[in-house]
C-alpha cells in the first residue's frame, strides 16, 4: 500500500485546546486512523521549505500528498520531477495554485489535482465583508487607541465612512464573489459591480442588483471598494500592479482574500503609504508564512490605520475545517477504493488535462 504525505501548520497548545483545529499537524484532519485502517502509511509535517525539508525528503516516494492553502507545500516542477510515485495531490480547502499544474499534467502519466470545492466559500465571503467594514469604518486604529489607553475621536473619525451609498466591485464572481455581493446587498451600496469572463445568470444579476463591467480598468476607476475573489493563474499573477492601482479611485479601499501573488506587494504598500489607497485588507500572502519584512505587514495610510491584514485565516474557521476535512476524506476514499468517482467540481487537473477553466484558458501540452 502507499504512503500519504500531509503538509499542515503546527497548532501547538491551541490544537490541544481546540480539537476542531483539524488542519493542524496535531489533529491531521481527523483521518490518521482511517488512513492507516486502509493499509496506508501517513507522514505529517509542517517542515516544507528548503531542499532538506521533511516535505522534500518524504515526497520522493509518496503516492498521495495533502496540503492546505493556509500552509501550502509548493509542488513545483522540480519537486514533481522527483516524486516518482505521486498520483494524487489534494488541497484541503480551495485553491490549487501552489501546484505547477502544467507539470502535474505531464508527470507520472498525469497527476490528479483535486480540492474540496465549496468547503470554505461562506467563510471567506464573511471575512471579505468583515474586512470591508473594518476598513471603511476605520476600526483598527480606533481599537488600537483603546488598547493603548488613548482617546481621540477626531483622529479616527476623520477617516471613517459609511458603506451605504458606496460603489463596491469584485474581481471574480464565482462561488465566493457571488456570495460577497449577496451579503453586501442589505448595506444599500450605490452600486454592486463585477468583472469576470463569465457573467452571472440574468436572474441572479437582477436578484442581487449587480452589474457586469467589461473592462477591469473601467470597473476599478468607479469603485470605492474593490475586492479580489479570483483564482491565481498566469493571467492574474501581479494583476494589481502600480499601473492598475493608479487607475483606482483615489481614496479607495482594496481587499484581497484570493491569493497574495495577485497583487504586487510593493506597489500596494506604496499606494497605501501615499494615501492613494485609503486602506488594504487581506489574509493572503506570498510566500506563506509571510516573511517578517513583508511590506504589507506594516504599511499604513498617512493618517494612520488603513491596514486590516491578518494571517491566512479567512477560509479556515472551525466550521470550514470540518467541511474540508470531510471533503478530503471523500476524495481519498474515491482514490483508495479504485472507484475514482471524484466530484467533477473538485477536479482541477485529471488524466493529463485541465478539468476546469478556473485557472485560465489553457491548451493541453
UniProtKB/Swiss-Prot annotation:
Chief location bin: cytoplasm
GO aspect biological process, one term: acetate metabolic process
Binding site for substrate: 94, 120
EC number of the protein: 1.17.1.9
Gene3D superfamilies reported for this sequence: NAD(P)-binding Rossmann-like Domain (3.40.50.720)
Compartments reported by the entry: Cytoplasm
Residues binding NAD(+), per UniProt: 175-176, 196, 231-235, 257, 283, 312-315
SUPFAM superfamilies according to UniProt: Formate/glycerate dehydrogenase catalytic domain-like (SSF52283), NAD(P)-binding Rossmann-fold domains (SSF51735)
Single GO MF annotation: NAD binding
Enzymatic reactions: formate + NAD(+) = CO2 + NADH
Site (Important for catalytic activity): 259, 312
GO cellular component: cytosol; extracellular region
Induction remark: Acetate induction mediated by the amdA regulatory gene.
Keywords attached to this entry: Cytoplasm, NAD, Oxidoreductase
Role of this protein: Catalyzes the NAD(+)-dependent oxidation of formate to carbon dioxide. Formate oxidation is the final step in the methanol oxidation pathway in methylotrophic microorganisms. Has a role in the detoxification of exogenous formate in non-methylotrophic organisms.
Family that this chain belongs to: Belongs to the D-isomer specific 2-hydroxyacid dehydrogenase family. FDH subfamily.
Binding partners and assembly: Homodimer.
Alphabetized HAMAP family for the sequence: Formate_dehydrogenase
Name the UniProt record assigns to this protein: Formate dehydrogenase
Species per Swiss-Prot/TrEMBL record: Emericella nidulans (strain FGSC A4 / ATCC 38163 / CBS 112.46 / NRRL 194 / M139) (Aspergillus nidulans)
